[in-house]
């Protein structure tokens, strides 16, 4: 039997025997549920200085080429270790810029006096997936081969590859297959040059899986990348010719890692240009999502603004310390994540393929279908509200848009009337126009009746004498009932009668006289 007072039961006071368990904050995390650490820049940098970073220095072209040969050999004979992973990071930070002689990712680290460097790397082999049987490098002869490529060109291509490998801190192995072709194309466009070293690099997925496992295993790798990339991001400005190179290769892939909810919300806010950011957050606000939405708001206000250009560590800190920004992860709030993902797809802000669709995120894989459907109704409501705002802005849209939306033809003076002074507009509105005069004439015709005859002008006759001895005019003789109906409703006449009377049908709303009957002219 259904009970309509479920809320009364749900809000009943807990038993007194459980009085000591009122605060959830006193509980330890259950399973692998981590507890969030509030982000603080100074505390974060102090934590990094406690043996989390290894030294990064400038490398010559010859040193880069020699280190790359060692990396390929180790990958081929299954001895790839943390030592080789550090070499990849060092080469990546020596990325050659588009401007000759520039290294945009190489920054100077000034550690505090109490700082300590990370210990020596491990030489234990990193095994992931199937062992690499050997890395096949095509043997090239003649022009265009690696044998004829200059050392500077090789070093530039190798640093480009190693910088690309940094993506696997956050990317899966499938990213290698899906992006390698475009990577080679982007190299040619950015540097306006070709490289046999890059063209001949066709690794298997084992490369990606081992690099990813190395980043997952060793904190010092992730921390060093997070610090150097954040520092370089703060130094580069969009006007710098190297900014696009670094953003394409690494910035856009590593920034806001683990802050998916914030990233999706900011993408939608940037798209919804007709409303302010606070209105969008108000639209999607849900008390059950309060922690996530509040964190989105705090990040936008305190960190992600034009006044914090020199501070970019907050964007990459989660790479090194995963306990930051937990409330903006998809796992913490699947419902809000699905709403934002659905909105991104509605407005074409994300890919629709299985690989790129935000609805295909691994953290959403176990979400119940009922909750997905409910989230889609919320995103549909957001779409409807924004469409209403768009329609209001398009009140003076052009003819093509109005025709497509069935809004009627545009007003010729719509824009000029908005700029017209009020006194001029009021004066113009008081002047009768031809359309208004026509409407007044038709209204007069309807009041008198289509087939009623107006009173003749001139002195009143005896029947019309309204003197004191005859206060009531004599009633004129009236035609029979049937004739009165035909006069009042001429469409009831037969075709022959209409022809005799001279009527013709113009519209369904009434008849127009040719002048042979006694109509008002």
Swiss-Prot record:
Residues 441-453, 493-504 have a biased composition (Basic residues). InterPro entries: Rhabdo_ncap_2. Disulfide bonds: none annotated. Transmembrane segments: none annotated. The lineage of its organism: Viruses, Riboviria, Orthornavirae, Negarnaviricota, Haploviricotina. The keyword RNA-binding applies. It is found in: Virion; Host cytoplasm. Residues 406-505 are annotated as: Disordered. It comes from the Viruses. It comes from Rice yellow stunt virus (RYSV). Residues 454-464, 479-488 have a biased composition (Polar residues). Encapsidates the genome, protecting it from nucleases. If expressed without protein P it binds non-specifically RNA and therefore can bind it's own mRNA. Interaction with protein P abolishes any non-specific RNA binding, and prevents phosphorylation. The soluble N-P complex encapsidates specifically the genomic RNA, with protein N protecting the genome like a pearl necklace. The encapsidated genomic RNA is termed the nucleocapsid (NC) and serves as template for viral transcription and replication. Protein N binds protein P in the NC through a different interaction, and can be phosphorylated. GO terms for molecular function: RNA binding. Keywords: Capsid protein, Helical capsid protein, Host cytoplasm, Ribonucleoprotein, RNA-binding, Superantigen, Viral nucleoprotein, Virion. This is Nucleoprotein. Residues 429-440 have a biased composition (Basic and acidic residues). Homomultimerizes to form the nucleocapsid. Binds to viral genomic RNA. Interacts with movement protein 3. One of its GO terms (cellular component) is helical viral capsid. Belongs to the nucleorhabdovirus nucleocapsid protein family.
